[in-house]
Amino acid sequence: MRQAHPSGLNQVENKCLFNSRGFSLIEILLVVAMTTIVTAISIPQIQSQVDSYRLNSAVAMAKWAIQSTRFQALMKGYPYQTAFSSANANYQIQNLPSGSTYQNVGNQVPLAAWPMTFSADTTINFRPNGSVTATVGSNIFTITYRGTTKTITVSNYGNVTVN
């Protein structure tokens, strides 16, 4: 009569299972090497996406500043302007409620926490009738971050386009 092995498996099956627990050192090293290679390939792509995101957020901030300042001029009934500083990469919103000198509205606002570059100082003036003029610089300016440039164009009536 045949007796069953105490584990319920015959000796050959038991030996195969006993020797096949876990991963070998070669298998682990191959997985680590492949993970390292994939990570090394993806890091430049991720950095490029982060740079693009940072530039796009600065451009969106500038666009928002222009559009909201135009809205304030239309709503309040007196001139407003947005002054972009190329030296400090920030902007200042100003208004002219009465008198001949523009007054700051709030503090200077940095365009981004990263070192952005403006093409030139630009001040865009918004009249209560909806007209827009550039009193310093032009109504076309660029913002650059790590070699990538976006051009912002403001039409005579406040339409903002980005290229």
Description of each model-found segment:
Residues 1-16, 37, 41-75, 79-163:
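N-terminal helix-rich module
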Residues 21-33:
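N-terminal signal-anchor/signal peptide hydrophobic helix marking the start
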